[in-house]
């Protein structure tokens, strides 16, 4: 199932930040990074403020990585507005 999501510049930025942290963590552990790497390249190539189609697996990966980033920001006492906005789009 494909879902169309409009990505603003802030949405792209927070998603790429979350995916990059996940990518480097998985690479350090020696796990497969092909799926997350492909998604990073896909999101990076998208123009801002345009709708893009994402599969259920891609949405799950984005949702889980952004949620982890949000939890890390909350633990540090940082603002989570950008992560919250993107999470709402993914549900």
Locate predicted features.
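Positively charged, low-complexity terminal tracts
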Residues: 1-91
């Amino acid at each position: 199932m494909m879902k169309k999501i409009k990505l603003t510049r802030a949405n792209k930025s927070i998603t790429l930040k979350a995916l990059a942290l996940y990518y480097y963590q998985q690479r350090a552990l020696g796990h497969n990074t092909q799926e997350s790497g492909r998604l990073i390249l896909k999101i990076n190539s998208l123009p801002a403020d345009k709708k893009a189609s994402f599969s259920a697996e891609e949405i799950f990966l984005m949702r889980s990585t952004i949620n982890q980033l949000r939890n890390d920001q909350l633990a540090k006492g940082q603002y989570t507005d950008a992560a919250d906005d993107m999470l709402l789009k993914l549900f």
